[in-house]
């Protein structure tokens, strides 16, 4: 498949736009005139912990007690401690950074198309090409080349600095805001950017640089450098010195090499097209040395709200299934970031096993922040210990496909041993058999009392037997 077009001539909906990504930064191209280009990155987070997770009652032992008591007041306390925390405050959460809006002179009929071979979006006004956009896979910056006079501005989400926005996901909707100081927009020497302070030392902003008919952009944070704006400007200047043609040639070559690693042709246009799109999206939002894809990958809903489900890591098979097929498809460079991340988070997972479950070993919060901490949510899965086994299986599969004995010795076995130690540490013996004190299956019976199944669910049983 050579290219796929947006639905209709144009779309005003962000979730019908065309996705671009380089495994670090993502953009969605949508709109008309103005043309909208979102700017996001996986690691843009407000990582302040919800204070409820620091209470002494936020523990597995207390959760068991509250579930089994049968009293309404205890169930309300259970909901307060473990469920309501997901949406009662805007943090911790992925952050929406905003977008760049382009106004073209005399545009009447804008549409756009995505060439997946080159990961490039072409923008047209009728039969005339007016712009191209790509997120460079080599330099990690966004690049726009325009062929018609245009102006552009930055659109910053209102909910960041005090105007309430909608918090979506987990069947709840409330008015939320981070309450940050208003962002400061600045323009100087061909650069346009904004600076956003938060309630900690963390800061971020979209930075753009214009050189003739080429506009370069990035999203920088204080994780990059204390002088994150200066850091971003230097990156953009280097990209601008190279120029569109050179960057695009190297970017296209990297995608050509990726596509050559494997391919499937069934003769069915729908199946083949879906296959191409899936592996295009996979590389767009996953790459070695960075973070694995959370719920929305490198993109975030551009609707003036917190990301759906706060853009977290959902280990109730959401995250795992995103990486289910990369080994068979020979996409190891892009896929192994998942096991690398889990290993890097091992100390945090060991801490969670100890502080929440009261056991030694490794347990992964099934609804997790970027830095591996619990977010709460429906406790039946967000705080289920067996979700960890799904995550651990990725180590098993990596070893089986690569045959890497050193990986087995230094990564897979230690991780599995830690998970096994933790799971066995919380199980209870009855009549010569081991049972989990609480057992569920993801999202069956939602977040009601019925969702705890007796004695143990097939879901939990299958995972524990595998372990």
Question: Whereabouts are the PLM-identified features?
Answer:
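Acidic/polar, glycine-enriched structural segments that form the non-catalytic walls/loops
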Residues: 1-312, 331-335, 342-351
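Beta-strand segments within the central parallel beta-sheet cores of soluble alpha/beta enzyme folds
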Residues: 4-5, 294-295, 337-340, 356, ...
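A conserved hydrophobic secondary-structure block that centers on an alpha-helix together
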Residues: 126-141, 160, 392-414, 418, ...
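The feature captures the catalytic groove of carbohydrate-active enzymes
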Residues: 143, 297-312, 359-409, 423-467
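Alpha-helical support elements that line or immediately flank enzyme active sites
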Residues: 145, 281-284, 319-333, 389-405
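Extracytoplasmic/secreted proteins, especially bacterial periplasmic and envelope-associated proteins
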Residues: 246, 250-254, 266-273, 277, ...
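Long, well-ordered core segments of solenoidal/helical folds
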Residues: 282-286, 340-353, 414-430
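Glycine-rich (often Gly-Gly/Gly-Pro-rich) flexible segments and glycine-rich loop motifs
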Residues: 314, 318-341, 345-353, 458-467
């Amino acid at each position: 498949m050579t290219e796929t077009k947006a639905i209709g001539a144009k779309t005003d909906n962000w979730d019908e736009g065309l996705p671009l990504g380089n495994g670090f930064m993502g953009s969605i191209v949508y709109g008309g005139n103005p043309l909208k280009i979102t700017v996001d990155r996986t690691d843009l987070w407000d990582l302040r912990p919800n204070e409820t997770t620091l209470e002494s009652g936020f523990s597995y032992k207390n959760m068991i007690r509250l579930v089994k008591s049968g009293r309404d007041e205890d169930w309300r306390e259970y909901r307060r401690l473990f469920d309501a925390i997901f949406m009662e405050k805007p943090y911790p959460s992925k952050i929406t950074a905003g977008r760049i809006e382009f106004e073209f002179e005399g545009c009447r009929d804008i549409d756009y198309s995505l060439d997946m071979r080159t990961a490039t979006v072409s923008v047209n006004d009728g039969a005339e090409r007016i712009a191209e956009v790509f997120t460079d896979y080599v330099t990690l910056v966004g690049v726009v080349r325009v062929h018609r006079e245009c102006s552009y501005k930055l659109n910053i989400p209102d909910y960041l600095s005090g105007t309430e926005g909608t918090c979506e996901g987990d069947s709840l909707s409330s008015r939320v805001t981070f309450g940050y100081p208003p962002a400061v927009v600045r323009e100087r020497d061909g650069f346009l950017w904004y600076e956003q302070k938060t309630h900690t030392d963390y800061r971020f902003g979209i930075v753009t640089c214009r050189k003739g008919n080429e506009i370069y952009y990035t999203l920088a944070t204080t994780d990059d450098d204390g002088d994150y704006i200066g850091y971003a400007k230097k990156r953009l200047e280097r990209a601008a010195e190279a120029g569109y043609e050179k960057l695009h040639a190297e970017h296209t070559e990297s995608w050509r090499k990726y596509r050559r690693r494997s391919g499937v042709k069934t003769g069915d246009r729908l199946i083949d097209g879906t296959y191409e799109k899936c592996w295009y999206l996979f590389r767009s939002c996953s790459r070695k040395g960075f973070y694995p894809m959370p719920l929305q990958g490198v993109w975030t809903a551009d609707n003036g709200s917190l990301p759906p489900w706060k853009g977290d890591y959902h280990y109730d098979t959401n995250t795992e299934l995103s990486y289910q097929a990369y080994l068979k498809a020979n996409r190891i460079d892009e896929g192994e970031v998942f096991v690398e991340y889990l290993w890097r988070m091992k100390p945090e997972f060991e801490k969670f096993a100890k502080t929440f479950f009261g056991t030694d070993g490794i347990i992964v919060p099934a609804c997790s922040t970027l830095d591996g901490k619990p977010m709460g949510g429906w406790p039946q899965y967000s705080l289920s210990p067996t979700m960890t086994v799904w995550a651990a299986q990725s180590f098993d599969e990596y070893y089986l496909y690569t045959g890497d004995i050193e990986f087995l010795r230094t990564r897979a076995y230690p991780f599995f041993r830690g998970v096994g130690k933790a799971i066995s540490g919380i199980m209870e013996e009855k009549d010569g058999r081991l049972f989990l004190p609480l057992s569920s299956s993801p999202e069956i019976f939602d977040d009601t009392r019925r969702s705890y199944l007796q004695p143990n669910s097939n879901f939990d049983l299958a995972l524990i037997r595998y372990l």
